[in-house]
Amino acid sequence: MKCRKCGGTASLELRRHNAAFCSPHFIEFFRKQVAEAVHRHHMFTTDETIMVAVSGGKDSLALWDVLIEDGYRTAGLYLDLGIFDYSKESRAKCEAFAAARGLTLHVERVAEAVGAPIPVVQQATRRPTCSACGLSKRYLMNRAALEHGYPVVATGHNLDDEAATLFGSVMHWQTDALPRQSPALASTHPKLVRRVKPLYRLSELETAAYAFLRGIDYIVEECPFAKGATSIAHKQVLDRLEEASPGSKHNFLFGFLDRARPAFERVENVELHECTSCGQVTTGAVCAFCKLADLVKRRTS
């Protein structure tokens, strides 16, 4: 295998691109894909400071690394979910990454915000763990960005993540979710920051390769609550399709974004309010996070 760029020995083959790259030119390719995502969707500028949500995994730390290398001002946000040793190790990876580069890392503890760590929340509410976790993450990312003055939050969602989410939404025809399936969500209220996904053009394999080549130390273990998650099953289905027809995930996601998503965008305006309990944005009187926190308090007290 020869590198498409220089003709030297390739270290990585990308079947969906019908190309192979040596290590230096793969890193160049990776950074160009991120730059294209940022440019195409006007995600942020060099005048802004970006809050990068990091989990200690390969995707979010790879994203933080790319943004640093490209000269963006950044700060990290780690959400401590309180998931046993997994959270301790993942937090340590984020702290080590930030310390080695002299970067700011903000830490928010879910237990302080919702009243209990995620394992206890799951037991108390009997709702799917990923549901309570996702709700808490979205709320705390937005709140932390507002409190610290960051206009945009960047997450490490990759092509595989986005294709699997879209697959689940289409399979169940969750038409409310489809308009929000986007690499960049604008601020629609003074108390909502922008949310962007600069890695959406890159696969999980590609982010893993970048992290390895850049020597990024990340947590390899999956979240213990991920076992049996529907999203994992969706990824496995798409993996089989990708193996049979390279580029399927890309075509599925990008076809939706380019041609189908506009048809699902809501015509009516959603009226936003400030939660009467916490002041964050909601469509009702009390936000879903405050309802969750209240339920946890009642069932654990």
Can you describe what each PLM-predicted range is?
Residues 1-27, 33-36, 42-50, 178-301:
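ATP/NTP-dependent adenylation/nucleotidyl-transfer catalytic domains that generate, transfer
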Residues 2-179, 188, 192, 201-214, ...:
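ATP-dependent adenylation/nucleotidyltransferase module used to activate substrates
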